[in-house]
A protein has these predicted regions:
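Short, charge-rich amphipathic segments
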Residues: 1-5, 55, 83-88, 136-154
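Fold-level recognition of mixed alpha/beta catalytic cores in primary-metabolism enzymes, strongest
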Residues: 98-99, 112, 116-119, 126-193
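Acidic/His- and Gly-rich active-site-bordering loop/insert found
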Residues: 2-107, 126, 131
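Sparse, context-dependent recognition of short Cys/His-centered cofactor- or disulfide-binding micro-motifs
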Residues: 8-9, 24, 40, 54, ...
């Protein structure tokens, strides 16, 4: 089955690259709510076009609306987490293609992972593969600033999941990422002399 999936993805490589290019050229830093809405719209359209699945877009007070869709049936659920915001301001990085590589804002973190997730579902559907589980996907728009608006939604979706995986693309040499260092923010106040 693995070879069948790989052959399918290789056959559709040009389309996969076009989908990644579409999302990368739709730039949006976490702080640009209007640009985030445009990226989210492109993402929802791409999910529908490629997988045939409908998306649910959560309302979020500050506009960082998470997008959810699912595929498959079964008792067990696997949750896939990703984000469509980038840390870079619009125009900070240029998009370019070189050999079989794409470069630009969000290619590596994490639009490559979003496109991989979407094409995984498309491959399963087109090849008639039943994952035997419910695959649920949640993509947020505020990850780069700590997921303040979406963390509660993600935690709620994770409660009944057998496993949760982040759609982080592999490293440059193809290794799977299984952990990361994380981030801590704190304030230190000093009084006195």
């Amino acid at each position: 089955m693995e070879q069948k999936i790989l052959a399918y993805l290789k056959e559709h490589e040009a389309e996969i690259f076009e989908d990644l290019k579409t999302l990368v050229l739709a730039e949006a830093s976490t702080s640009d709510i209007d640009a985030l809405a445009k990226v989210r719209e492109k993402l929802v359209t791409l999910i529908k076009e490629r997988t045939g699945e409908d998306c649910f877009v959560y309302e979020a007070e500050n506009g960082h609306c998470p997008v959810r869709f699912q595929y498959g049936k079964g008792e067990e659920k696997i949750l896939f987490i990703g984000h469509y915001d980038t840390v870079h301001l619009i125009g900070a990085l240029k998009y370019y293609a070189e050999r079989n590589e794409l470069h630009g804002p969000g290619v590596y973190d994490m639009k490559g992972g979003l496109v991989s997730a979407i094409w995984t579902v498309k491959a399963y559907k087109d090849l008639g593969i039943d994952p035997g589980k419910r695959l649920e996907f949640i993509f947020n728009g505020d990850e780069e600033t700590g997921s303040a608006e979406s963390s509660e939604i993600i935690c709620e979706l994770a409660k009944d999941a057998k496993a949760a995986l982040v759609c982080e693309p592999c490293t440059a040499n193809g290794d799977l990422k299984t952990g990361r260092k994380g981030l801590v923010r704190f304030t230190v106040r000093v009084h006195g002399k």
